[in-house]
Amino acid sequence: MADHVGNFRRRTAFSPCSQGGAGQDLAPLGLRVYRTERYSSPMPTDIVLVHSSDLHVDEDRAAAHGGDGTAALRSVLATARAVRADILLLAGDTFENNQLGGAILDRAGRRLTDASFPVVILPGNHDPVLAQSVFVRGGFGKLPNVSILGVTHNEAVPFPAFDLEIWGHAHRDYFNMAPLRGPRQRSTRWQVAMAHGHYEPPETRANPLRPSWVFGDEEIAATAADYLALGHWDRPMRVGNGAVPAYYSGSPDLAETVNLVRLTAAGDVVVTREPLSAES
């Protein structure tokens, strides 16, 4: 597949989909390796990304885990810390809604501040970027290690030290939108895309009763990204036709894992699932 940069080919070895074309569950701790041939010279080190979504931080009274509405966030942060992640990606619905009170937002902010790594957040359909969204009221955009698409950055977050760009379209209201519209021109060695919405396989794409926030194989392929971090589904799943490594992480509560994505010095993209670490 031709990249925006030029001489790029990705070789993938996908096993056949087992979900009627809708994708395939990631095997527990399974390994997927995607090889790029974009550069002849290796990077000095690997880049380690942790991808999660649909944490649904909520008021304590509505929460499991002993009544801690930030428990899923705490577990994901602990896991990212344990695997020494360079960057944590939260692909939508980090918060249950935009009506959460100050106490739970303050606690979530403290947990994010205590992280020893950058966090990139994509607002989803539960927590869209509104004038009084949780991101604005909670002051999350002021946290030095937190980048929020649609708040601190309009569309893309650069990481020059890694020659990496992470881009995505935030939900800005409660209406329908195209999560993968307008793919960005590649300007860095590594490019990761984020989207929060519903993957629809080719055989059902024409269904007029399909959900909102839809994208399919063509939109995925058009990103030409090295990895597409997806949110909105509670189950971890690989989707698409293989042109781009596109994965739902699933929610921490149901999946009990995060996706571990390693952008290797040799140019490979290695995707596995990592069990949630003991909360700390």
Which residues make up each language-model segment?
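His/Asp/Glu-rich metal-coordinating catalytic cores
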Residues: 87, 97-257, 262
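Leucine-biased recognition of intrinsically disordered, low-complexity hydrophobic segments
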Residues: 26-31
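Acidic, His/Gly-rich catalytic cores of divalent-metal-dependent hydrolytic chemistry
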Residues: 254-280
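N-terminal active-site segment of His-dependent metallophosphoesterases
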Residues: 33-107, 180, 186-187
